[in-house]
Amino acid sequence: MRRRIAPALLLPFALLLAACTATSSADDSGGAGSNTDGKGDLTLRVGDQKGNDEAVLRAAGELDDLPYKIRWSTFTSGPPILEAVSAKAVDIGGVGNTPPVFAAAANSNIKVVAAKHGTADGETILVKKGSPLKKVADLKGKSVAVAQGSSAHYQLVASLAKAGLSIKDVKVTFLQPADALAAFTRDRVDAWAIWDPYTSQALRSAEARILTTGQGVVNGLNFQVANPSSLDDKKKAKAIGDYLKRLRRAQDWVYKHPEAWAKIWAKETGLPYEVALDSVKRTNGTRVYVAVDKDAIASEQKIADTFAKLKLIPRRFAFADYVDTRFNAGQPPSSTAPRSYGTATEKTEPTK
């Protein structure tokens, strides 16, 4: 008898609705999730997702001595955060590696100001444990679930290319993560291209195994993106610089306290603690803040060019035009290796 996923296990995925998906809905007002920290005359408006930057900063104690106010607005995913940044509804917000590409393609009013680099072990193509598929080349003619325009979509395209295939060689089924999990669990697709924490959840509850990871094909980057007018305001720019320093220290805290952060993250998102801890050790805690340098820009340009070729974005553009490097000082290069906790729940070498 095939094991089925109980509806309760699907709920956390609906709540998390991917930071790196370019087709997600959002609480555009941010009203219900809005709150304020700090003191002073200046207010920095920050776009966030549940269980992300605000939760990390609070857990690390980085919101205890703010010399300015932060007003938080909560969104369900990265794209609406960038819509808010572009519209001057927020000053800055954190997103994955794909939303800035789509926002820039739409000529949005944004500037990437900071980056963090993590392992790509959580960026995976999953198959069932009993699947006969052993390598990416075996996907030819098979069905693969993926969220359209997501980081996983790019990973699928790049992984297939590395194996000598094109996206036309597989049967792509565009599904958001919760729907993809259900389809994968019920054997309606042969494989699932996805990211953490969905990877960690599937490995624990869906009898999944990793066919390949994103190592060597995706850049493992996440970004902080600001509005240019906020950067032109000297006081706000100074606050943004301070905010980024706090994020860097908070990320260090996450790496040093994986269990403590996993408990908080699980409570924030509804994920089981074990899944949260797996994801922290596989992906979340491995991230280190790095410079938005030429290599980082080039890797994003590659994503943009790929999506333009697939006609997923309306135009080709120079990603460098949407970057502000003023906060790079003192940051290691984007090629800096992610941190590591050793082996997570399942670790496999990428297969070709």
What are these regions (language model features)?
Residues 1-10:
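Bacterial N-terminal signal peptides that target proteins for export
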Residues 16-19:
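C-terminal motif of bacterial Sec signal peptides marking the signal peptidase cleavage site
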Residues 21-24:
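Bacterial signal peptide processing site
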Residues 27-166, 172-174, 190-194, 209, ...:
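Short, glycine-/small- and polar/acidic-enriched structural segments
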Residues 54-60, 82, 86, 97-100, ...:
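Extracytoplasmic/secreted envelope proteins and their assembly/folding machinery
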Residues 98, 178-269:
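Pocket-lining segment of extracytoplasmic ligand-binding domains
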Residues 233-314:
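Secondary-structure end/capping motifs
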Residues 305-352:
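Conserved C-terminal helix/tail region of periplasmic/extracytoplasmic solute-binding proteins
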